[in-house]
Swiss-Prot record:
HAMAP family: Ribosomal_bL20. Its main location: plastid. One of its GO terms (biological process) is translation. This is Large ribosomal subunit protein bL20c. GO terms for cellular component: chloroplast; ribonucleoprotein complex; ribosome. Keywords: Chloroplast, Plastid, Ribonucleoprotein, Ribosomal protein, RNA-binding, rRNA-binding. The keyword tRNA-binding does not apply. It is found in: Plastid, Chloroplast. Binds directly to 23S ribosomal RNA and is necessary for the in vitro assembly process of the 50S ribosomal subunit. It is not involved in the protein synthesizing functions of that subunit. It comes from Lotus japonicus (Lotus corniculatus var. japonicus).
Length: 121
C-alpha cells in the first residue's frame, strides 16, 4: 500500500482550533490537547450561559418592578406586591412585558404609579 502524507491536514485542523483559543491565557492557547479541551469548555459555557442570561434578566426585571411598586406603596400606605401587580395587569388585559414595565419603573416611576392606580380600581 502506498503511503499517504497528511501532515498538512492535521496542522490545518490544529491551526483552526488555535485561532479560536488565541486569546486564552498560558498553556490554554499553546498546547494542542489543552487547546481542544478549552475550546469544548468555552463552547459548552457559551451554550449554557445563553439560557442563563435570559433567566437572570427576567429576575432583574422582576426585582426592579417589585422595587418600583414598593416605592409607590409608601406613598399610598398600602401593600401591593409584584405578583398582585402582574395578575391585575393581565386581568385588565394590559399586555406589557416585564422588560418594558421594569424600564417604566426605573425611568418613569410616576407612570408606574398611574398604571398601578388604574388597574387596582
Amino acid at each position: 500500500m502506498t503511503r499517504i502524507k497528511r501532515g498538512y491536514i492535521a496542522r490545518k485542523r490544529r491551526t483552526k482550533i488555535r485561532l479560536f483559543t488565541s486569546s486564552f491565557r498560558g498553556a490554554h492557547s499553546r498546547l494542542t490537547r489543552t487547546i481542544s479541551q478549552q475550546k469544548i469548555k468555552a463552547l459548552v459555557s457559551a451554550h449554557r450561559d445563553r439560557n442563563r442570561k435570559k433567566r437572570e434578566f427576567r429576575g432583574l426585571w422582576i426585582s426592579r418592578i417589585n422595587a418600583g411598586i414598593g416605592d409607590n406603596d409608601k406613598k399610598k400606605n398600602i401593600y401591593y406586591s409584584y405578583s398582585n401587580f402582574m395578575y391585575n395587569l393581565y386581568k385588565k388585559q394590559l399586555l406589557l412585558n416585564r422588560k418594558i414595565v421594569a424600564q417604566i419603573a426605573i425611568f418613569k416611576g410616576n407612570c408606574l404609579f398611574m398604571i398601578a392606580n388604574e388597574i387596582i380600581t
